[in-house]
Amino acid sequence: FHVPDDRPCIKPGRCPLVPDATCTFVCKAADNDFGYECQHVWTFEGQRVGCYA
């Protein structure tokens, strides 16, 4: 399996708690049919942030 590279989110929506955060679509290997799983990761100034209280 080839795990896709990290890339900008296509439709990131927004991050209510940190409006200036950057969205990245991050994929990692996983034990499923695709061989990987992906998630939206929000970061601000190099730190991962939560977008919802």
UniProtKB/Swiss-Prot annotation:
Top-level taxon of the source organism: Eukaryota
UniProt: Zn(2+) binding residues: A53
InterPro entries referenced in this protein's UniProt entry, alphabetically: MCP_Inhibitor_Domain_sf
Keywords: Disulfide bond, Metal-binding, Metalloenzyme inhibitor, Metalloprotease inhibitor, Protease inhibitor, Zinc
Disulfide bonds: C9-C23, C15-C51, C27-C38
Any one GO BP annotation for this protein: negative regulation of endopeptidase activity
Molecular function GO labels: metal ion binding; metalloendopeptidase inhibitor activity
Role played: Metallocarboxypeptidase inhibitor. Has an inhibitory effect on bovine CPA1 and porcine CPB1. Does not inhibit D.melanogaster svr (carboxypeptidase D). Shows no activity against serine proteases subtilisin or bovine trypsin, cysteine protease papain, and aspartyl protease porcine pepsin.
Protein's name according to its UniProt entry: Metallocarboxypeptidase inhibitor b
Organism the protein comes from: Nerita versicolor (Four-tooth nerite)
